[in-house]
Amino acid sequence: MDSEFFQPVYPRHYGECLSSTPAPSFFSTHMYTILIAIVVLIIIIIVLIYLFSSRKKKAAAAIEEEDIQFINPYQDQQWAGVTPQPGIAKPAGASTGSAGKPVMGRPVTNKPVTNKPVTDRLGMAAGGPAAASAPAHPAELYTTATTQNTASQTMPADENLRQRNTYTHKDLENSL
């Protein structure tokens, strides 16, 4: 009785509804995303080039002005009181100054400032400030270590080589 109300309704031109439309291409659907990504990459590249070029310019300017300080705590003391002679070039990285002038950017220590940085360092290494201030012959600051071959001179050459760590070409020839 109510079956006429529940009948499926088909459009007159059923084929028109089922006609296929071409699928959009990947580029057309993501065109704006791709363009934004390209623009962002170009901006990043430009910023990186600018940063690296400014670093190179700053480094070149620092080298020209000799602002680069090498790690040498005795650098300013080494040339203190030395007057430059005409025609003689100063070593690279050396700066002139006085021993009483404070050195900027270096840690403050209780070490006495002298014009003998090499002997001061050796004296400090040998026994501290007391040893450094004591008058010592420069040869006493250096020690020499002698090594001896522990292998007996009477044992065979191949046994001698077995006990040693390093070999020379002559040692290997003699063992043959």
Swiss-Prot record:
Similarity remark: Belongs to the asfivirus envelope protein p54 family.
Skewed-composition ranges (Low complexity): 123-154
Parts of the chain that traverse the membrane: 32-52
Name of the protein this chain belongs to: Inner membrane protein p54
Complexes and interactors: Interacts with the host light chain cytoplasmic dynein DYNLL1; this interaction is critical for intracellular microtubule-dependent virus transport toward viral factories.
Annotated source species: African swine fever virus (isolate Tick/Malawi/Lil 20-1/1983)
InterPro entries: ASFV_p54
Taxonomic classification: Viruses, Varidnaviria, Bamfordvirae, Nucleocytoviricota, Pokkesviricetes
Region (Disordered): 82-176
Positions of the UniProt region annotated as Interaction with host DYNLL1: 142-154
Domain of life per record: Viruses
Role summary: Inner envelope protein involved, through its interaction with host dynein, in the intracellular microtubule-dependent transport of viral capsid toward viral factories. Seems to induce caspase-3 activation and apoptosis. Plays a role in virion morphogenesis by recruiting and transforming the host ER membranes into the precursors of the viral envelope. Involved in virus attachment to the host cell.
Membrane topology: Single-pass membrane protein
GO cellular component: host cell; host cell endoplasmic reticulum membrane; host cytoskeleton; membrane; viral envelope; virion membrane
Inducing or repressing factors: Expressed in the late phase of the viral replicative cycle.
Subcellular compartments: Virion membrane; Host cytoplasm, Host cytoskeleton; Host endoplasmic reticulum membrane
Keyword tags: Apoptosis, Cytoplasmic inwards viral transport, Host cytoplasm, Host cytoskeleton, Host endoplasmic reticulum, Host membrane, Host-virus interaction, Membrane, Microtubular inwards viral transport, Transmembrane, Transmembrane helix, Viral envelope protein, Virion, Virus entry into host cell
GO biological process, any: microtubule-dependent intracellular transport of viral material towards nucleus
